[in-house]
């Protein structure tokens, strides 16, 4: 199945603690159905000291379920994603709300 949300997409959080916030996807894990979004779903982790790394409490992004994020359209609102096959046979993603191409 083609990916509706990809690395580099600007997305908005639809539910949860960060509802309404936007960020850029920097990693997608399709098998787990989750994505990592820069600046969203920040958690604190206690890091044990190693020879190469200092110990302490670090903040990092936790995965967020793909069902809880949506691509932000050109109008700044979240939109669902569909697919369209162009005349030359190329498959592109389109915004369901406006019909505009997302990439291509």
From Swiss-Prot:
Q: Which UniProt keywords apply?
A: Ribonucleoprotein, Ribosomal protein, RNA-binding, rRNA-binding
**GO MF terms on file?**
rRNA binding; structural constituent of ribosome
**Main role?**
One of two assembly initiator proteins, it binds directly to the 5'-end of the 23S rRNA, where it nucleates assembly of the 50S subunit. One of the proteins that surrounds the polypeptide exit tunnel on the outside of the subunit.
**CC per GO annotation:** ribonucleoprotein complex; ribosome
Protein name, as recorded? Large ribosomal subunit protein uL24
Q: What is its quaternary makeup?
A: Part of the 50S ribosomal subunit.
Output the lineage of the source organism.
Answer: Bacteria, Pseudomonadati, Pseudomonadota, Alphaproteobacteria, Hyphomicrobiales
The record's listing under SMART domains reads: KOW
List the InterPro entries hit by this protein, alphabetically: KOW, Rib_uL2_dom2, Ribosomal_uL24, Ribosomal_uL24_CS, Ribosomal_uL24_KOW, Translation_prot_SH3-like_sf
Task: Supply the source organism for this entry.
Answer: Rhodopseudomonas palustris (strain HaA2)
